[in-house]
Regions:
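Short, conserved beta-strand element in jelly-roll/cupin
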Residues: 35-50, 132-136, 144-161, 198-200
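Short histidine-centered beta-strand/loop micro-motifs
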Residues: 15-17, 29-35, 76, 139-145, ...
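Short acidic-glycine-tyrosine-enriched beta hairpin
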Residues: 54-70, 163-180
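Structural motif
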Residues: 47-49, 56, 72, 150, ...
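Short, structured motif recognition centered on aromatic/hydrophobic residues
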Residues: 23-25, 40, 44, 59, ...
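Ordered, small/hydrophobic-rich secondary-structure cores
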Residues: 1-71
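A short, N-terminal "cap"/entry segment at the start of jelly-roll beta-barrel domains
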Residues: 1-31, 80-127, 211-222
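Ligand-binding loop in jelly-roll beta-barrel domains
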Residues: 69-93, 171, 179-205
Length: 222
């Protein structure tokens, strides 16, 4: 299979798994310890508090949370999040990190697209980059990345185009894109399409390549 898609209206449980990741939507509350996987989360709804290494952190929509494997932590409240377990992670530089993506300045990608960075090596998460992609109406050229990626559609409407075939995208759609797979996420609506992405190896969400292997560069601004 070149890629995988899944849709679920469920507020918990596993969505799907690939060799690099397990992606699911779940209630964060409870006691947690994973000795095998790093975990990166993005809060969708609700609120609460996460306590990691004696530090308390508020959880609300737009909060990104990274917890390294072997780190015990607890959470309270009714916050639900997209959780991505990172299989066989590299040693982390920190036990955890919290980023408020509502306060992050966007970076620029191709075709007028922007992104907000969550968990990254800069905050101690060595294995992956987590981001929210902001996709305006329209279509970018076909391209590929040199990383494996899982995507969760936060809101908006669009299509995933691969090899001349299209699959609809809407809130709750989950996608796994293997590295070097030529594709395009097109926004077919009249408002912004927002997607949550996590990819490995870590890098920049703006790095993309056209099908002939040339680097897709940012267009010049007047």
């Amino acid at each position: 299979m070149q890629y995988a898609m899944h849709e679920s209206d469920a507020a918990g449980g596993r969505l799907f798994e690939c060799p690099e990741f397990t992606q699911r939507v779940r209630l964060i509350a409870g006691e947690h310890l994973d000795d095998r996987c790093d975990e990166v989360l993005y809060v969708l709804t609700g609120s609460g508090t996460a306590t990691v290494d004696g530090h308390e952190h508020d959880l609300r929509p737009g909060t990104a949370l990274f917890v390294a494997r072997g780190t015990s932590w607890t959470a309270t409240g009714d916050a639900h999040a997209v959780s991505v377990l990172v299989h066989d992670p590299a040693p982390a530089a920190a036990t955890h990190a919290v980023v408020d993506l509502t306060a992050v300045q966007p970076g620029e990608a191709t075709a007028g697209r922007e992104f907000l960075l969550g968990a990254t090596p800069e905050v101690g998460c060595a294995s992956v980059t987590q981001f929210v992609g902001l996709i305006p109406p329209g279509r970018a050229p076909d391209h590929f990345h040199r990383y494996d990626e899982v995507i969760y559609v936060l809101d908006g409407e669009g299509v995933l185009e691969i090899g001349g075939e299209q699959a609809p995208l809407r809130s709750g759609t989950c996608i796994h894109l293997p590295r070097t797979l030529v594709h395009c996420l097109a926004n077919t609506g009249d408002s912004e399409l927002r997607v949550l992405g996590v990819f490995t190896p870590a890098g920049s969400p703006a790095e993309a390549y056209y099908p002939d292997g040339t680097l897709a560069v940012l267009p010049e601004r007047n």
